[in-house]
Curated annotation (Swiss-Prot):
GO terms for cellular component: nucleus. Residues 1-60, 271-311 are annotated as: Disordered. GO terms for biological process: DNA-templated transcription. The lineage of its organism: Eukaryota, Viridiplantae, Streptophyta, Embryophyta, Tracheophyta. It is found in: Nucleus. Keywords: DNA-binding, Nucleus, Transcription, Transcription regulation. InterPro entries: bHLH_dom, BIM1/2/3, HLH_DNA-bd_sf. Its main location: nucleus. This is Transcription factor BIM2.
Length: 311
């Protein structure tokens, strides 16, 4: 009985050893297969990333080739890449020859390689000069905006405010007086001539009383009030005004050989007080004191020097 039990135990132990030996290599193969599957997954992920980037790169290349095909005239869509690039090179060389030809005919242009940026800058400069304000010189009209060379010229123009075409206004903080004087006999002594400033209120009162229609008409027509500045009157306007004034004084019976005649134009805040004068083409630009004229013409020529005010 003991021997039978011992044999049975030995058989059971042998079967366990055989089963353990048989299960050992199968577990090793499963571990290796798991590792291989992980490595394959990593490799496939890397390949997919590379494929995505490659697809993007190829799509960009195709888009740029399509742009080139649209730029080049008479290009065939079925050509291969090499022949198409050769056609692009030929077209670029043709454009360079044209540019060199036109640059040779205009020596003032720069000899640097031509690019798109300078062409765009020149085109923008021409368009901006077309709408740029140009100052008027002496009221005659607009001058030449860009004389000389095309690229070397920088045109700068400042906006000018002009009240009248022939009377430009120069801005100044203090009021200035433009005086026009005539001396018939320079050797005469000026000691007997009184100053002009005390007679200003009398002239203001006379002009306001005797010429209401003129002051009202000019006050309605000229709405611009000049707070300060200088008006430069042209020589033709000055001579015409002076001749009309001289003629008016001679008609009044004043001897100009014994008098000094001066015309002063003062601009300022007094322009609203109705101190105006008629146009230089009128026959009577000044108003005279009738009482002084009746008393003595010579006394009026020596003591009453009229002062004109203009807007």
């Amino acid at each position: 009985m003991r021997t039978g039990k011992g044999n049975q135990e030995e058989e059971d132990y042998g079967e366990e050893d055989f089963n353990s030996k048989r299960e050992g290599p199968s577990s090793n193969t499963t571990v290796h297969s798991n590792r291989d599957s992980k490595e394959n997954d990593k490799a496939s992920a890397i390949r997919s990333k590379h494929s995505v980037t490659e697809q993007r790169r190829r799509s960009k290349i195709n888009e740029r080739f399509q742009i080139l095909r649209e730029l080049i005239p008479n290009s065939e869509q079925k050509r291969d890449t090499a022949s198409f690039l050769l056609e692009v090179i030929d077209y670029v060389q043709y454009l360079q020859e044209k540019v060199q030809k036109y640059e040779g005919s205009y020596p003032g242009w720069s000899q640097e390689p031509t690019k798109l940026t300078p062409w765009r800058n020149n085109h923008w400069r021409v368009q901006s000069l077309g709408n740029h304000p140009v100052a008027i010189n002496n009221g005659s009209g607009p001058g030449i905006p860009f004389p000389g060379k095309f690229e070397d010229n920088t045109v700068t123009s400042t906006p000018a405010i002009i009240a009248e075409p022939q009377i430009p206004i120069e801005s100044d903080k203090a009021r200035a007086i433009t005086g026009i004087s005539i001396e018939s006999q320079p050797e005469l002594d000026d000691k007997g001539l009184p100053p002009l400033q005390p007679i200003l209120p009398m002239v203001q009162g006379e002009q306001a009383n005797e010429c209401p229609a003129t002051s009202d008409g000019l006050g309605q027509s000229n709405d611009l009030v000049i707070e300060g500045g200088t008006i430069s009157i042209s020589s033709a306007y000055s001579h015409e005004l002076l001749s009309s004034l001289t003629q008016a004084l001679q008609n009044a019976g004043i001897d100009l050989s014994q008098a000094k005649l001066s015309v002063q134009i003062d601009l300022g805040k007094r322009a609203n007080q109705g101190l105006t004068h008629e146009e230089p083409s009128s026959k009577n630009p000044l108003s005279y004191d009738t009482q002084g004229r009746d008393s003595s013409v010579e006394e009026e020529s020596e003591h009453s020097h009229k002062r004109m005010k203009t807007l």
